Structure formats: structure tokens, C-alpha cells
Design a protein with these regions (language model features):
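Hinge/lid segment of periplasmic solute-binding proteins
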Residues: 1-39, 179-187
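Short, solvent-exposed loop/beta-turn-alpha elements that line the ligand-binding surface or hinge
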Residues: 2-12, 56-60, 102-123, 171-176, ...
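Paired acidic/hydrophobic, glycine-rich loop segments that form the ligand-binding mouth/hinge
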Residues: 154-159, 166
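Short helix-loop capping/hinge motifs at secondary-structure junctions, enriched
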Residues: 46-57, 211-218
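Short helices/loops that flank or line small-molecule/ion binding pockets
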Residues: 68-73, 131, 142-156, 171
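Extracytoplasmic/periplasmic solute-binding protein
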Residues: 18-40, 48, 65-113, 120
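Glycine-centered hinge/linker elements that transmit conformational signals in sensory
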Residues: 68-75, 109-141, 187
């Protein structure tokens, strides 16, 4: 970068910087500001009586196969209530295909190739679409945190940046509100994979080519946004993760 030294760039998370390099030969085109991943949010208040009655533990939620199995048990135990939902279906496909050995999108020489592996797609189908069709999973509101607020789900996968929207109460159809405890778990992976994966997403900024004065001013602003004090303040208010390693 013409406006950032190597030492300055080394202070930023290297994987965030790599994401902003659109090809191996390119410079830094997208400057990282804030990043997020995904987590599993669990209504612990609703989980405890179910877990005690059915002999399940949070270890069973470590894999997608386990989530589907637990959801089936919850459906039977609760007389037909939904257990789980997730935001961002695309993340399930992209991360899942990568975990299972053949990423859906692969880059080669600066170009992206689209790959569909039938066996991998079938495994992802069996662990999401099938339990969804059976009523074990559901999506009713705009976001799954909305569905937890209404008691329609007791678990969901959503962005870590959405943690501030995680409900602390459940409201029933009659308007009665019940306080709940929510616990956050690692996002599930597929059973038996060699390496667990999680999505990396978030905000970055680009500087439009103009003249040196404007470009340098924009770089100064980006430098300010990623200083530890400012970056931590933004992270706390937004729920995103800071990009500077000293602020993480």
C-alpha cells in the first residue's frame, strides 16, 4: 500500500488483510474495519428441562448431525415444537463444502470456479433440509433471534455481530414475557472432518482513486478507525471483532 507501512499492516490481523487482496499479485484493495463470525445461541432456560428428560448434552450440538438428532428428540418431547434455525443459509453451504473437502467456490489464477460435489451436497441436504421439512427446524421471523424471542426456537446459529439482538425474554402469543438465560456455543461442524471451519465476514472500506491529497486523507481516516481505542469502541457498540491484533 502506498499509504501504509509494512509495520502498520503487520499490526492488523493477517487473515483479514488477505481477504482484502483480490488476487495474489494485487495490493490491498479492501481495508478491514470490523469482522465477525458465527456462533450457536442456546436458550438455556428451555434447554435444561429437555436435556434432563432426554439425556442430551451440549456436546451433542458440536456437529450438524448431532443438532439434527437433538432436534428430532426435542420435537418428540415437546409435542411438535421446533428446535433450531439459522441465519445465512449461504454460510452453511460455503463453510460446509469447505469442511467436507471441496469448497463450492475455488480460485485459480485470479478466477473463481464453481464446484458442486453431489455427495457433499447430499450430506448438507440431509442435515438441514430434511430436518427442516420434518418440522425440527424452522424460520418464521426476519431473523432467527426473532424466532427465539417468540419461543418458536430454542437454538439458532447467527452472526457474532448479532449478539446484541439475542433475546433475554420470550414472549408467548398472549403477550406474557418470561426471562431466559442464553448461552453461546461454538458453531457446529460436520462429524469426522479433519478441520473445523467457520465463516469470516464483516466490513471493509475501499479508497476510490482520485488525487494524492484525498487519498492520503482517506488513509488517515482508516488509520484512525483501526487504532486500538477507536476500534475497540466500535467493536463494543457494533458487536464486531476488532481488526488490530493489539485490540483483540
Amino acid at each position: 500500500s502506498a499509504y501504509f507501512t509494512e509495520d502498520e499492516l503487520k499490526e492488523l490481523n493477517s487473515s483479514y488483510l488477505k481477504e482484502g487482496q483480490l488476487s495474489q499479485a494485487s495490493g490491498l484493495y479492501i481495508f478491514p474495519i470490523q469482522k465477525s463470525s458465527e456462533a450457536l445461541y442456546l436458550n438455556w432456560t428451555a434447554w435444561e428441562p429437555f436435556a434432563a428428560a432426554c439425556g442430551v448434552t451440549t456436546d451433542d450440538l458440536a456437529t450438524w448431525e448431532g443438532v439434527a438428532d437433538v432436534a428430532a428428540k426435542y420435537y418428540a418431547w415437546s409435542n411438535g415444537r421446533h428446535f433450531f434455525g439459522r441465519d445465512a443459509y449461504a454460510n452453511y453451504l460455503l463453510v460446509g463444502s469447505t469442511e467436507l473437502g471441496e469448497a463450492m467456490f475455488q480460485t485459480n489464477g485470479g478466477k473463481a470456479d464453481f464446484h458442486l460435489n453431489r455427495e457433499i451436497l447430499r450430506r448438507m441436504w440431509d442435515n438441514f433440509v430434511v430436518p427442516y421439512a420434518k418440522g425440527y427446524y424452522n424460520a418464521a421471523g426476519r431473523y432467527r433471534s426473532d424466532d427465539m424471542k417468540t419461543g418458536d426456537l430454542i437454538a439458532y446459529v447467527g452472526a457474532t455481530s448479532s449478539a446484541s439482538f439475542t433475546p433475554t425474554q420470550v414472549t408467548d402469543p398472549d403477550g406474557n414475557m418470561t426471562d431466559i438465560e442464553v448461552r453461546v456455543l461454538e458453531v457446529p461442524s460436520f462429524a469426522g472432518v479433519e478441520q473445523r471451519c467457520a465463516v469470516q465476514q464483516g466490513a471493509g472500506m475501499v479508497v476510490v482513486k482520485s488525487d494524492e491529497t484525498r487519498e492520503r486523507a482517506a488513509a488517515t481516516f482508516l488509520r484512525y478507525l483501526t487504532e486500538p481505542e477507536a476500534n475497540i469502541a466500535i467493536a463494543l457498540k457494533s458487536g464486531y471483532m476488532p481488526v488490530r491484533t493489539s485490540a483483540a
